[in-house]
Design a protein with these regions (language model features):
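Cytosol/matrix-facing ends of alpha-helical transmembrane segments
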Residues: 187-190
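Interfacial loop/helix-cap signal at membrane boundaries in integral membrane proteins
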Residues: 136-185
């Protein structure tokens, strides 16, 4: 309860007498629907990624639709990629300095989208390796996101009310830590 980071581990043994160069895929699928928010306060649903070089970026599913994919892929050696929607985020968090290629695309004009990361490996003959990657999948709780990976807290989107909402949420979180109940925290804040 209360833990949203899942450690994943893959074990690969190259039994051959030749080196191999497999690629590991980590991806999410989304149906492209975003029936969340209102016309006055819309919420973003789509791909998001973070890297030290480019900071935090959001990519709407419309931007990766069909042949006009404006994102396609991005090759870097740090950061994370995920899918965000109102109140929730899921992201793959790879170890730093590990080469990776982020991607986001529509699958066969189906309004189904995949976003993820490819990681090339080099495995020598008779070598056996372990690959450890974290998956964060849970609510956009700023304190948990800050612990998960650099830039994850940027997935919290208060929209145009950010200047008011951000400090208010910090106070609300402080109350929640004390009373351990979000409902009671909201009542006490208001």
């Amino acid at each position: 309860k209360g833990l949203y980071e899942i450690g994943t581990s893959f074990h690969v043994f190259n039994k051959s007498n030749q080196g191999i160069t497999p690629t590991v895929y980590y991806q999410f699928l989304h149906d492209g629907e975003s029936n969340q928010g209102s016309a006055f306060m819309p919420s973003f649903t789509g791909t998001a990624y973070y890297s030290e070089e480019e900071d935090f970026e959001k990519i709407s599913f419309d931007d990766v639709k069909g042949e006009n994919n404006e994102f396609k892929s991005k090759v870097i050696n740090n950061g994370w990629i995920g899918i965000i929607q109102r109140y929730f985020v899921s992201s793959w968090i790879l170890p730093s300095k590990q080469d990776r290629k982020f991607f986001s695309e529509e699958i066969d004009n189906s309004n189904i989208y995949r976003s993820g990361v490819l990681t090339p490996l080099e495995i020598m003959p008779k070598e056996d390796i372990s690959i450890n990657v974290n998956l964060y999948s849970g609510p956009q709780l700023k304190q948990d996101l800050e612990k998960a990976a650099p830039g994850m807290e940027l997935t919290v989107d208060y929209g145009m009310l950010h200047i008011i909402a951000s400090p208010l949420f910090s106070v609300l979180s402080g109350i929640q830590k004390f009373v351990n109940d979000w409902g009671v925290s909201i009542i006490l804040l208001t």
